[in-house]
Curated annotation (Swiss-Prot):
This is Small ribosomal subunit protein uS2. Keywords: Ribonucleoprotein, Ribosomal protein. GO terms for biological process: translation. Pfam families: Ribosomal_S2. It comes from Brucella canis (strain ATCC 23365 / NCTC 10854 / RM-666). The keyword Ubl conjugation does not apply. Transmembrane segments: none annotated. InterPro entries: Ribosomal_uS2 (IPR001865), Ribosomal_uS2_bac/mit/plastid (IPR005706), Ribosomal_uS2_CS (IPR018130), Ribosomal_uS2_flav_dom_sf (IPR023591).
Length: 256
C-alpha cells in the first residue's frame, strides 16, 4: 500500500476552501487565508495540500510503529463519519461527547470501561437472575456507557496521536492531549487557533463532504501504516526461531 492520493479538485468539490464569515475569523489564521468572497473567507488550498500530506504521513508512521490513533469529532455532521472511519481502519474514536479527564484521568475512565465490559457479559448471557426491570436498567446503563466509551473500549491506554474535527468544539480534548504530550492532527477552519495544533490541516470543518474526505484519507493512511507494520513483522518473523504470540490471542491482563 501507499499513502492515499487526493487532488486539488477533490478538495474544491468537497468545499474544503470555504471558511466562515469574515467577521468570525481568528486573526491567527491570516497566513492560511487566500482571500474573501461575499464576506466568506477562502482558505489557501495550496497550503492545505502539503499540510494534509504531512498529516497523512504522520498517521501512517504512527500506526506503522504500533501506535494508536484516536479520531475525535462530536458535532452532529461528523459523528457517524468519525466512527465509520475509525472502525474501518482499526483505530479508536470519541463521537458523542468528550468527557473531561478522558485522557488525563485514564484510570477512572478505565474503571468505567471495565463496567461496560461487565455489562456486555451480563447482557450477552441474557442477564440470568435479573427481573425485567433490573435488566432494563442494566441495558440503559450499558447504552449510556457505550455511547460515551464504546469507541475507546479496546484502546488499552491513551493514544499515540489524535485526529480532531472542529478544534473549537473539542478544545478540552486538545488541552488534555497537550498536557500528556500527545501530538494532534486537526482540521483548522478560519475561526480556529492553529497554535495548539501539531499537524494543522487548513480547511472547512462544517461541510459533511469535507469531513468525509478528511476522515477517509486519515483512515486510509492508518491502513497504510497497518500494511507497513505487517510487512515489517513478516520480515522479522521469518528470521525468528520461535513465532511470537499475537497480542490478540493472549489472555487480557488483570485490570486491563
Amino acid at each position: 500500500m501507499a499513502l492515499p492520493d487526493f487532488s486539488m479538485r477533490q478538495l474544491l468539490e468537497a468545499g474544503v476552501h470555504f471558511g466562515h464569515q469574515t467577521h468570525r475569523w481568528n486573526p491567527k489564521m491570516a497566513p492560511f487565508i487566500y482571500g474573501e468572497r461575499n464576506n466568506i473567507h477562502i482558505l489557501d488550498l495550496s497550503q492545505t495540500v502539503p499540510l494534509l500530506n504531512s498529516a497523512l504521513k504522520v498517521v501512517s508512521d504512527t500506526v506503522a510503529r504500533g501506535g494508536r490513533v484516536l479520531f475525535v469529532g462530536t458535532k452532529r455532521q461528523a459523528s457517524d463519519i468519525i466512527a465509520d472511519a475509525a472502525n474501518r481502519s482499526a483505530q479508536y474514536y470519541v463521537n458523542a461527547r468528550w468527557l473531561g479527564g478522558m485522557m488525563t484521568n485514564w484510570k477512572t475512565i478505565s474503571n468505567s470501561i471495565q463496567r461496560l465490559r461487565k455489562l456486555d457479559e451480563l447482557l450477552a448471557g441474557e442477564a440470568q437472575g435479573f427481573t425485567k426491570k433490573e435488566r432494563l436498567n442494566l441495558e440503559r446503563e450499558r447504552e449510556k456507557l457505550d455511547r460515551a466509551l464504546g469507541g475507546i473500549k479496546d484502546m488499552g491506554s491513551v493514544p499515540d496521536l489524535m485526529f480532531i474535527i472542529d478544534t473549537n468544539k473539542e478544545a478540552i480534548a486538545i488541552q488534555e492531549a497537550k498536557r500528556l504530550g500527545i501530538p494532534v492532527v486537526a482540521v483548522i477552519d478560519s475561526n480556529c487557533d492553529p497554535d495548539q495544533i501539531d499537524y494543522p490541516i487548513p480547511g472547512n470543518d462544517d461541510a459533511a463532504r469535507a469531513i468525509a474526505l478528511y476522515c477517509d484519507l486519515i483512515a486510509r493512511a492508518a491502513l497504510d501504516g497497518i500494511a507497513r507494520q505487517q510487512g515489517a513483522m513478516g520480515i522479522d518473523v521469518g528470521a525468528q526461531v520461535e513465532a511470537p504470540v499475537e497480542p490478540a490471542l493472549q489472555a487480557p491482563a488483570e485490570g486491563a
